[in-house]
């Protein structure tokens, strides 16, 4: 029997502070709950949306009920008894960090149980010897930044100086990351990628998870904006991924949409598609749902919830994007094939109402749809790896080292 799996990952879409949130300073964080509360109280009204958060198709998959189980309260405006078509759970992260790579790797069978390297100083963040080595190997004459920063704010603050000097902008965050911003046309995209490749080689031994190229365009502070040509250089996963097992045992296709391939350092990816906006990510995903052959795994990361709204503390924008996504989810559901398994999940939280601009340690929703899957609560998962283990079970693959299967199809004991 030919099967497909479709994974829709809403980057940063947490549903309540997890039991270890205190260790991360994240008690009280609840990305979905606090967005829903703001919407319900008309605090997220804008020219684009108003009133309570309207996500009928996500609710039908069990989003509200999953959040109720995770946070002990139903998001304001959600139905206590929706027309449920999906099976739902919520998951606690096992990995030691709350970053994108840790969450993604864990759900495919490789939890991060070691500590990443970090640049903890808010200013003068990078050791001089590292900066000197990058300069020596890449022949750059100087650099700007060298601090913790918001990616959109730092190009406003330093973009004009960058155009004058052509010095790249180096910055970081609470995550294990080294980011380099440069003008796509004046500095050159190929030059930026080459610089990032060299920086990655230097930083990999320090267990810095990612070096990220952040190209932008524009001529002044008011017009600078990042382009879709972001590129992530990531450390390779330390354990075998579900993707690799699927290819080896079933000769499957693993289709990356958005930044999935970069997150997994291109390990186990057979096809990849880029997309610049939330609309484009939805378009490409729908195209693959319609056209990808059987024996495929389609995996999309919807990054804009995190990058454009979570980190930017934009509650109204996040709500509007969720409501748009929900309309496109309807199209995905309408185009699923007889034996498709749909999974909707997240990788961490990034509560736009919470203190600071960093990720938040939260439970994530784990929502499943298949025509033969009984709508029901599947319990709490102690690891995101339950997602990968459930996929392995569905596809008839060898089990992963981590996680448990959550699925029980109609007719099974």
Curated annotation (Swiss-Prot):
> What does this protein's UniProt record list under function?
Isomerase that catalyzes the conversion of deoxy-ribose 1-phosphate (dRib-1-P) and ribose 1-phosphate (Rib-1-P) to deoxy-ribose 5-phosphate (dRib-5-P) and ribose 5-phosphate (Rib-5-P), respectively.
Provide the GO biological process annotations: 2-deoxyribose 1-phosphate catabolic process; 5-phosphoribose 1-diphosphate biosynthetic process; metabolic compound salvage; nucleotide metabolic process
Keywords, sorted A to Z: Cytoplasm, Isomerase, Manganese, Metal-binding
Q: Name one GO cellular component term.
A: cytosol
Q: Which cofactor does it need?
A: Mn(2+)
Similarity-based family: Belongs to the phosphopentomutase family.
Q: What is this enzyme's catalytic activity, as reactions?
A: 2-deoxy-alpha-D-ribose 1-phosphate = 2-deoxy-D-ribose 5-phosphate; alpha-D-ribose 1-phosphate = D-ribose 5-phosphate
InterPro entries registered for this protein in UniProt: Alkaline_phosphatase_core_sf, DeoB, Metalloenzyme, Phosphopentomutase_DeoB_cap_sf
Q: Which SUPFAM superfamilies match?
A: Alkaline phosphatase-like, DeoB insert domain-like
One term of GO molecular function? magnesium ion binding
Protein name (database record): Phosphopentomutase
The entry's Mn(2+) 2-binding residues are 306, 311, 359
Instruction: Just give the chief location class.
Output: cytoplasm
Q: Which gene encodes it?
A: deoB
Cytoplasm as a keyword of this entry, yes or no, is yes
Q: Which PANTHER family does the annotation name?
A: PHOSPHOPENTOMUTASE
Give the species. Helicobacter pylori (strain P12)
The EC number(s) attached to this protein equal 5.4.2.7
Q: Where in the cell is it found?
A: Cytoplasm
